Regions:
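A generic local structural motif
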Residues: 195-198, 284
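Structural signature of tandem-repeat unit edges
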Residues: 1-12, 22-35, 45-58, 68-81, ...
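Extracellular/lumenal glycan-associated surfaces
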Residues: 180-181, 260
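Extracytoplasmic soluble-region selector
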Residues: 233-298
Length: 298
């Protein structure tokens, strides 16, 4: 089998449905498909062209693992979660577009994607789980979404071409081996919000420089570990909010995010409500509707 095009009547694709179909080059899933099992296309080593349903919300576990000929893919605008190992071992993958709806990237999602050179995570992304980009040996350019609060264990381990990275302003923790064996990493910008960095986060501290805010935890960490530190003060030129108008029911909550330009701006984001009897907002931008009316969140 080299090509599969489904009729619109298909609503469910089961586990391992096409696993090991090594001659399959093209597959088109209709918009009628609502769910996918795990390992659906695992080991389809000739697969080059995929069309996914427009309304899918979840890219399933190990869906494209070891699809070694897959070079590019567009993820539908409705997808909220890319499950663990979804593209692990896709050694030819060099372009992927991620939607503004995306919330979570699972464990080892892009592990071993050795041709992936750059990727942009949307600001809607809240979590990038451990090992997500492990051994992406060609990765040189990655933009992380502003909603991310933790760089989890081994997220960028073995990204041997990565020379610099800017961590978003809300990142609080950098976990064990987050940048282990990043042999070319020379510059990392760490925000004021960061309050915890593992002693094993970096393999070559003597070769790198941390850029951050004077007096921050990042500076303390740099001094403790004999890492060069450069204090910087960069003004925000533009702020982009995830929503400009929002309607919430009583007691309903919504997480608002602010994208800063330039990304390494050192200005602090402070949230406030024009009327806390109608809507409250905490220091992270989490809004809670209290009663009927209108309030301006700034």
């Amino acid at each position: 089998i080299k090509e599969i095009v489904f009729p619109d009547s298909v609503v469910d694709v089961q586990d391992y449905a096409f696993a090991g179909c090594r001659s399959l080059k093209k597959i088109v899933f209709p918009d009628s498909v609502k769910s996918f099992g795990k390992d659906v296309l695992c080991g389809c080593t000739s697969l080059k062209e995929v069309q996914l349903p427009k309304n899918m919300e979840w890219l399933s576990y190990s869906m494209f693992v070891n699809c070694t000929s897959l070079e590019e893919i567009d993820i539908p605008d409705s997808v909220k979660v890319i499950d663990s190992c979804a593209f692990e071992g896709c050694t030819s993958l060099n372009r992927i577009s991620l939607p503004q709806s995306l919330k979570t990237i699972g464990v080892s999602t892009f592990r071993g994607c050795t041709s992936l050179e750059k990727i942009k995570l949307p600001d809607s992304t809240k979590q990038v789980q451990g090992n997500a980009f492990e051994n992406c040996e060609a990765l040189t350019d990655i933009k992380l979404g502003v909603g991310i609060k933790s760089i989890e264990s081994k997220t960028f381990q073995g990204c041997s071409s990565l020379e610099f990275i800017i961590l978003p302003y809300q990142v609080e923790t950098i976990e064990d081996n987050a940048f282990k064996n990043c042999t070319k990493l020379r510059k990392i910008t760490i925000p004021k919000a960061t309050t915890s960095i593992s002693d094993s986060a970096f393999s070559y501290p003597d070769k790198m420089t941390i850029y951050g805010v004077a007096g921050s935890y990042a500076e303390q960490y740099a001094k403790k570990n004999d890492i060069a530190f450069v204090a910087q003060q960069i003004a925000t030129e533009k702020i982009t909010l995830s929503e400009t108008e929002l309607t919430l029911g009583r007691n309903e909550k919504y997480q608002l995010t602010a994208g800063l330009n330039p990304m390494d701006s050192t200005d602090e984001v402070i949230w406030s409500s024009s009327d806390e009897k109608i809507a409250k907002v905490d220091k992270t931008g989490n809004i809670e509707a209290i009663s009927a009316g209108e309030a301006v969140i700034t």
